[in-house]
Curated annotation (Swiss-Prot):
Listed name of the protein: GTP 3',8-cyclase
Associated pathway: Cofactor biosynthesis; molybdopterin biosynthesis
Binding positions for [4Fe-4S] cluster 2 per the UniProt entry: 257, 260, 274
Record EC number: 4.1.99.22
Binding site for S-adenosyl-L-methionine: 30, 72, 123, 194
Source organism: Salmonella typhimurium (strain LT2 / SGSC1412 / ATCC 700720)
Length: 329
C-alpha cells in the first residue's frame, strides 16, 4: 500500500513512539511514585524482536522516518541491542532514538550506537543529586551524568535531556540548567507536567505553564528555531553564546495538537492515536507472520481515521493513560 499516513485533519505522521516494556526501575514522583506494578503482563508478554521488526517495517512502508523506543525503561530489556538492530533494518527509518532514565547508559552507549541508535534522550529532573534522588527514588545522579558523557564518547553529537517542569521543585532552577548546557551540545527539554489518571493531585500542586520559561528565554535573547517534519513537539530555542539548546513541550498550549506527527504502539502491540486517547487498536494478531504486512498496514491506516483533532486535557480527561509508563509517555 505504501502511502503516507495522513489523518482526517491533513496531519501527516512521520514519527512512531514504540514502547517495548512498561517496567521501570525508577519511582519518579510524576510517573510511578509507588514503583512499577505489573498490570497482568509478564516480561514474556511484551512485543518480541520479530514482532517489533514487523510493526516497524509496516510503519516504514507507510512513511515513518523516525522511531523512538520508549518504556518503562527500554534498556531493562536484555534484547534491547537486538531491538535497535531490528528497527534499523528498515532503510526508510532515518532516525532511531531511545528515551531512557540513563541507568545503563554508561555501560551500553557504545553498543547501542554500534547497533544503529542515532539519538538519546535522558530524563534528568534536577542537577542536584539529593533532589534527583528525591524525585526518582534512586540515588543514581552521578551514574546518569556519567552515562551522558559516555553517549558523547560513543559518537552521539547531541544528547537530549528531558526535564519535567514542576512548580516549587525545579521551575526556579533555570540559571543552573543554562550554565550546564552552555559548553555542552545538549538540548534540554522542559516538559510541562501533564495530568494522568493517577497523578491528578500532583498535577494540581505542581503544574506550571512553560510560557513562563519561554518569556524568560526570549527576554534573554534566545531564538525560536523552525521544526523539521519528523521532530517531536518541542519548541526549540538557541542562543549564540550557548552550545546547547532549550526545548519547551507545552501540551496545554492552544494549537499544540495542530502539528501532531506521531503515533504510539504499546509494549503489548496496541496502536494508540494519542497519549491521552481512549482504548487502542490491537495490532498483535497481524504481527505473527511476514505475509500479514499488507493487512497490518491497512489496519493502521484505517485506525487513523478515528484520530481526534485534539486531546482533552483541558477538561481533565486523561483518557486511558493512568501513568506515563503505560503506553510510553
Amino acid at each position: 500500500m505504501a502511502s503516507q499516513l495522513t489523518d482526517a485533519f491533513a496531519r501527516k505522521f512521520y514519527y512512531l513512539r514504540l514502547s517495548i516494556t512498561d517496567v521501570c526501575n525508577f519511582r519518579c514522583t510524576y510517573c510511578l511514585p509507588d514503583g512499577y506494578k505489573p498490570g497482568g503482563v509478564t516480561n514474556n508478554g511484551f512485543l518480541t524482536v520479530d514482532e517489533i521488526r514487523r510493526v516497524t517495517r509496516a510503519f516504514a512502508s507507510l512513511g515513518t522516518e523516525k522511531v523512538r523506543l520508549t518504556g518503562g525503561e527500554p534498556s531493562l530489556r536484555r534484547d534491547f541491542t537486538d531491538i535497535i538492530a531490528a528497527v534499523g533494518e528498515n532503510d526508510a527509518i532515518r532516525q532511531i532514538a531511545v528515551t531512557t532514565n540513563g541507568y545503563r547508559l554508561a555501560r551500553d552507549a557504545a553498543n547501542w550506537r554500534e547497533a544503529g541508535l542515532t539519538g538519546v534522550n535522558v530524563s534528568v529532573d534536577s542537577l542536584d543529586a539529593r533532589q534527583f534522588h528525591a524525585i526518582t527514588g534512586q540515588d543514581k545522579f552521578r551514574q546518569v551524568m556519567a552515562g551522558i558523557d559516555a553517549a558523547f564518547d560513543a559518537g552521539f553529537e547531541k544528547v537530549k535531556v528531558n526535564t519535567v517542569l514542576m512548580r516549587d521543585v525545579n521551575h526556579h532552577q533555570l540559571d543552573t540548567f543554562l550554565a550546564w548546557i552552555q559548553p555542552r551540545p545538549i538540548q534540554l527539554r522542559f516538559i510541562e507536567l501533564m495530568e494522568t489518571g493517577e497523578g491528578s493531585d500532583l498535577f494540581r500542586k505542581h503544574h506550571i505553564s512553560g510560557q513562563v520559561l519561554r518569556d524568560e528565554l526570549i527576554k534573554r535573547g534566545w531564538i525560536h528555531q523552525l521544526r523539521q517534519r519528523s521532530d517531536g513537539p518541542a519548541q526549540v530555542f538557541c542562543h549564540p553564546d550557548y552550545a546547547g539548546e532549550i526545548g519547551l513541550i507545552m501540551p496545554y498550549e492552544k494549537d499544540f495538537c495542530a502539528t501532531c506527527n506521531r503515533l504510539r504502539v504499546s509494549s503489548v502491540g496496541k496502536l494508540h492515536l494519542c497519549l491521552f486517547g481512549d482504548g487502542g487498536v490491537s495490532l498483535r494478531d497481524l504481527l505473527q507472520d511476514d505475509a500479514q504486512q499488507y493487512a497490518l498496514e491497512e489496519r493502521i491506516s484505517d485506525a487513523l481515521r478515528e484520530k481526534k483533532q485534539t486531546h482533552f486535557l483541558h477538561q481533565s480527561n486523561t483518557g486511558i493513560t493512568q501513568n506515563l509508563s503505560y503506553i510510553g509517555g
